[in-house]
Amino acid sequence: MSAVNENNLEGVSETVLTLRKVVVNESEPLARRFRALFSLKYLACLQPPSEDTLPAIEAIAAAFSSKSALLKHELAYCLGQTRNPDAVAFLQQVLKDKEEDVMCRHEAAEALGALGYEDSLEILKALKDDENEPEVIRETCDIAVDRIVWENSEARKAEKLKPSDFTSIDPAPPMPLEAAEPSIPELEKTLLDTKLPLFQRYRAMFALRDLASPPDLPTAVQAVDALAKGLKDPSALFRHEVAFVFGQLCHPASVPSLTECLSNQEEAGMVRHEAAEALGSLGDVEGVEDTLKKFLNDPEQVVRDSIIVALDMAEFEKNGEMEYALVPDSGAPAAVSA
């Protein structure tokens, strides 16, 4: 694929140009770059696509030159949510780059799985079976292959899935609805069974997530407690996904587990960073902001960066702002100051 052309921006709208300048600028505060990214994501995800959609995808991809692993991994996540084939080549390039940060490569693999295009299977299968690759890459590619196969299967068309409160394209769908809905203990058993394929365990994870939303659902606390047990799993990839789900749920019952995870200096950076951002989404819960501030000078860069973003998110939660972006996630995008 050709690299993002920085010189061919003729005809790109002022909104996209302004957001692009922010997201690629290493001198901009990280929190502001994240807000610009989520604004570009809104444009990149438009269905049907608008004249801003491809330029927004290219603007997101242009920021892969950043030094921030945290930002780059979020770029990959956002491209995976676009349902747009124009994002595939950018993500494949990131995944193939052995010099790229592992967390970013993992997110690119997961994003290719979310997009669901079969032309990504070749690279994903090759890396899944490459013993020279880090475990997190092999595991992510394994799940991504299973998701793409599922996405394009006849079995998927026959499945009935419970409607979800969440619009995200997840690494795996929730468990299908059978004659009787699986109980939380049954889902927990699948979630924690390390002998099962990761894709199947992820399906249990997202089924539990959907039983924990909205937070006043009678099953919510029990489902959160079941998910929390997944934070003790031997797989760092699995633990990080549990923390991500907690960030989606914003359930106060997850705060103790997330705090323990963030506080564990022996925990993998990709897990601690996800715990930090999940706590940021719970910023209106008493004590969370003070917990986050304790890690502003953490030895690990990705954790420090996550704390900056998490505190910005916490401030956003406390202020009751409508959208964590420089333009809204719904309605017509507005211009922003450069």
Curated annotation (Swiss-Prot):
Top-level taxonomic group: Eukaryota
SMART domains per UniProt: EZ_HEAT
Translocase keyword on record: no
EC number of the protein: 1.14.99.29
Residues binding Fe cation 1: 73-74, 106-107
Stored HAMAP family: Deoxyhypusine_hydroxylase (MF_03101)
Function as written in the Swiss-Prot or TrEMBL entry: Catalyzes the hydroxylation of the N(6)-(4-aminobutyl)-L-lysine intermediate to form hypusine, an essential post-translational modification only found in mature eIF-5A factor.
PANTHER family xref list: DEOXYHYPUSINE HYDROXYLASE (PTHR12697:SF5), PBS LYASE HEAT-LIKE PROTEIN (PTHR12697)
UniProt-recorded name of the protein: Deoxyhypusine hydroxylase
Protein source organism: Aspergillus niger (strain ATCC MYA-4892 / CBS 513.88 / FGSC A1513)
Annotated gene: lia1
